[in-house]
Regions:
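A conserved acidic beta->alpha catalytic loop
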Residues: 41-50, 96
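Acceptor/aglycone-binding surface of glycosyltransferases and processive sugar-polymer synthases
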Residues: 67-83, 88-91, 99-175, 202-212, ...
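Conserved sequence signature across two-component system core domains
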Residues: 10-11, 38-42
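Short loop->beta transition adjacent to catalytic acidic/histidine clusters or analogous donor-positioning motifs
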Residues: 2-5, 25-38, 47, 60-62
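Conserved donor nucleotide-binding strand/loop of the catalytic core
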Residues: 35-38, 49-82
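Hydrophobic helical membrane-anchoring modules
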Residues: 1-3, 169-233
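Donor nucleotide-sugar binding loop of glycosyltransferases
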Residues: 13-16, 44, 72
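Short, well-formed alpha-helical segments that are part of the catalytic scaffolds
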Residues: 13-28
Length: 233
């Protein structure tokens, strides 16, 4: 296993994925890290899969996992399970909304921390997403502990060895496992580092969950987050 595994779920990002992978590869190489980018294609219906396969053929540090569509949460959870042997796991989404500029801040502070995460700023989200973010934060703070601010931020670096026991207990169909993991960081009193990361609007593609479906998904994820808390303790 490499020292760092980047878990990157992708769904219908044909227009962005080549640029995103190029940016992250350049940033990681500049830091001289022993890394692998594991790209999980979650049943994309556009040209995403052939695009990432072409890139992977030229770069052995990019691994492609093609899987049936199951959703963002189950996909990143599979990525975590597949790479529990890595010293570090970093999760980032493939839409380009969070760039690699602040990764060096996380990586350079890793020796003193167990869980390092971004706090999205300049985020131009619709009211519906802001509401679900507030609710998610409240649930995690209430049931796990008030520590991580941006509880669902897909810009997180952590030591899987400290979370392995719990990661394997999270149900595979969990909608937002990152909420639970942020809660675990607080409950287990991990050493947590947080830093602001600039959020930019996506230039291609579109969000997969909108309006009423977003609230239904948020309700399900909050329920799963609460139930896991009582299941484990």
């Amino acid at each position: 296993m490499p020292e760092l595994t980047v878990v990157m779920p992708v769904y219908n990002e044909e227009g962005a994925i080549s640029s995103v992978l190029a940016q992250w590869s350049e940033a990681l190489q500049a830091l001289q890290i022993d890394y692998q980018i594991a790209v999980y294609n979650d049943g994309s219906k556009d040209g995403t899969l052939p695009a990432i396969q072409t890139i992977a053929q030229k770069d052995p540090r990019i691994a492609v996992v093609d899987k049936p569509n199951s959703g963002h949460g189950p996909t990143i959870l599979k990525g975590y399970h597949d790479h529990l042997g890595s010293s570090w796991i970093f999760q980032i989404d493939s839409d380009g909304e969070l760039g690699p500029e602040k990764f060096v801040v996380l990586w350079s502070n890793r020796a003193a921390y167990d869980f390092l995460i971004g706090n999205r700023i300049c985020r131009k989200s619709p009211l519906s997403r802001k509401i679900t973010t507030w609710i998610s934060r409240g649930i995690v703070w209430l049931f796990y502990g008030r520590l991580v601010f941006d509880v669902n931020c897909p810009y997180r670096l952590f030591r899987p060895s400290l979370l392995k026991e719990y990661l394997l207990q999270i149900p595979l169909d969990t909608f937002a496992p990152n909420l639970i993991i942020a809660g675990l960081a607080a409950h287990l009193r991990l050493r947590v580092f947080q830093t602001d990361v600039v959020h930019t609007d996506r230039r291609t593609g579109e969000v997969s969950i909108k309006k009423w479906k977003l609230f239904k998904a948020a309700r399900a994820s909050c329920r799963q987050t609460i139930l896991f808390r009582w299941k484990v303790w």
